[in-house]
Amino acid sequence: MKLKVEIVGLVSAVLILSSVLALANQSNNEHLLPFKEKTIIDFHAHVAGLGYGNSGCFINDEMRNNFRFKFYLMAMGTSLKELEREGDKVIFKKISAAVADSNVVDKTVILSLDGVINEQGELDKAQTQIYVPNEYVYEQTKLYPNLLYAASINPYRKDAIDRLVQAKANGAVLVKWIPSIMYIDPADPVIIPFYQKMVELNMPLLSHTGMEKSFSHAKDELADPRKLDLPLSLGVNVIAAHIATTGHSHGEENFERILPMVTQYPNLYGDISSLTQINKLGYVKKVLAHPELKGRLIYGTDWPLQFFPLISPWYHLDELKVSEAISISKIKNQWDRDVALKIGMGLDAEAFTLGNILLASKAL
């Protein structure tokens, strides 16, 4: 209760301060972005849809009735009326335009999202909170040169390996899992053949690690980072989304659980998406305190979760100067603002360029 009161107070203070700063000059503040070229790839951006325009997407009633639903529509810059009129595909158009407007981010990986799979190896719509099919993301990303396709395949599907092969043929750059809402146990030996095929195809796995609070409910025990020991030991290149920030497993902080894994497995990386959210205060500082993470960090935004009150430079005045917070808050482009905030908090340029270097060299 005390923490909630403190967060509400912090948000209120930032609202007042932001109103004052809204009167200030709204410059682009390119000097906050120390990159000579537009080369950064964002490896972690979500889309969603309601099936408009025959997208095949859906959000179940539980999630649509959740308070988060309206916030997510707002964060994606859309509305029910617009989706119905333009189709779900309008979200891709908006993302592409925003990335094109960025001074430093060149491309964004758009994540498909598979659902829960039943005992027959088929999609369980009743258990699935959100579904974004591979085919839809593939077709839409083909239309925009600055959007990259990421597949999502629940390995419990009866045709999971066939889907993986197809995803590779269609140019997917990785496979995305959120085990805690897809009900995948990454440590389940049953899915070893799927992992072996991933290695054969050189297909990386981007898997959520740590507590999940973006959905109506989640089985957080499935996002224990140590469950990734199995794919890592088999040679799968794994990107631990959010570097297991937040949550505990077996009485230990998830972040502490992943640190020895970084030393143990050279094929383990962590993405820096969501690290500046209000529920993760201090985690950038924690990351910087561990030299073993240097050279293992990959840039991601967790778009659309970049909006106030989830993220603000004013939450991080222990790591930013007031002048830096003012300058960052003036940046209009979401991607540029995200990069500037993370740079300002101490993350070095390598964390923003490693992903595209590895992707280009096929090391991912």
Regions found by a protein language model. Name each.
Residues 11-19:
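Bacterial N-terminal signal peptides
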Residues 114-220, 284:
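Active-site gating/metal-coordination segments in enzymes
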Residues 37-39, 104-107, 143-148, 170-173, ...:
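Short, well-ordered coil/turn segments that N-cap beta-strands
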Residues 25, 245-364:
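H/E-rich (His + Asp/Glu) clusters that bind or coordinate divalent metals
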Residues 22-111, 117-128, 338, 349-351, ...:
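An N-terminally biased module of ancient metal coordination in phosphate/nucleic-acid-related enzymes
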Residues 158-168, 186-191, 216-232, 248-262, ...:
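Distinct, well-ordered alpha-helical segments
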Residues 46, 113, 152-156, 178-182, ...:
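Active-site beta-loop-alpha junctions enriched in small/polar residues
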Residues 41-45, 108-110, 149-151, 175-177, ...:
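Hydrophobic faces of well-ordered beta-strands that scaffold small-molecule active sites
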